């Protein structure tokens, strides 16, 4: 996993979902439509 505030790609959604969620709340991420989609796609 990369920096905690890094951009979230598909691989990192599965690798570090919490990192992706944090970035999404900061509007720095490009997560799936919903948080649950991160888990479903893994």
From Swiss-Prot:
Cystine crosslinks: 1-15, 8-20, 14-31, 16-42
Gene3D superfamilies, A to Z: 4.10.40.10
UniProt keywords (A-Z) are: Disulfide bond, Ion channel impairing toxin, Knottin, Neurotoxin, Secreted, Toxin, Voltage-gated sodium channel impairing toxin
Extract the InterPro entries matched here.
Delta-hexatoxin
Provide the protein's localization: Secreted
The record ties this protein, via Pfam families, to: Atracotoxin
Q: Name one GO cellular component term.
A: extracellular region
- An annotated Gene Ontology molecular function: toxin activity
Please name the SUPFAM superfamilies in this protein's record: omega toxin-like
Q: What is the tissue specificity?
A: Expressed by the venom gland.
Q: Present the record's domain note.
A: The presence of a 'disulfide through disulfide knot' structurally defines this protein as a knottin.
Which family does the record assign? Belongs to the neurotoxin 06 (delta-actx) family.
Known role: Lethal neurotoxin. Slows the inactivation of tetrodotoxin-sensitive voltage-gated sodium channels (Nav) by binding to site 3 of the channel, resulting in repetitive firing in autonomic and motor nerve fibers.
Protein's recorded name: Delta-hexatoxin-Hv1b
